[in-house]
Amino acid sequence: MDTKFSTAIHMLILVSEAETPMNSDQIAQSVGTNASYVRKVAARLGHAGIIGSRGRSGFCLLKAPDEITFLEVYRAVEETDHVHVFDIHQNPSDACIVGRNIRPVLGGMFRHAEEVVEDELAGATLADCMARMREEIDRNSHQQEGKRQ
């Protein structure tokens, strides 16, 4: 798994919380990547109708944060309809009893786990993540205040 999904969530929070539109250079600085990668992720989010571009001035959300599910974001940036977390090695030996049976056994177990992940992503919204972010910021600011005293 690569980092497009977490990058997309980071971007969407920034765009949602910014008082003025943020461009790809500003987002890239916060994410810790380059602007071309941000534009690549943004293009996928744009095709999915999640964000729009305001010319060179920056990006804007096209939906309210409580209407954007993590599953929708995942599907947009990974360009797939199914959550894919696990891979199975490709060439197990048919001469071995385990090798002959490992792919169907693990395939079923892995698909079940991916369905659970998919359900969790479908139930989580950008607004949920933003609320947790605010809690984390508040907790960290209180910890910093305690250290100063």
Where are these regions (language model features)?
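Short alpha-helical segments that sit at the start of domains
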Residues: 1-11
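Short helix-capping/hinge SLiMs at alpha-helix to coil transitions
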Residues: 15-19, 63-64
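Short acidic, hydrophobic short linear motifs in intrinsically disordered regions
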Residues: 20-28
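Beta-hairpin "wing" of winged helix-turn-helix
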Residues: 48-56, 60-62
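Conserved segment of winged-helix/HTH DNA-binding domains
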Residues: 65-91
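C-terminal regulatory/oligomerization modules of transcriptional regulators
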Residues: 90-149
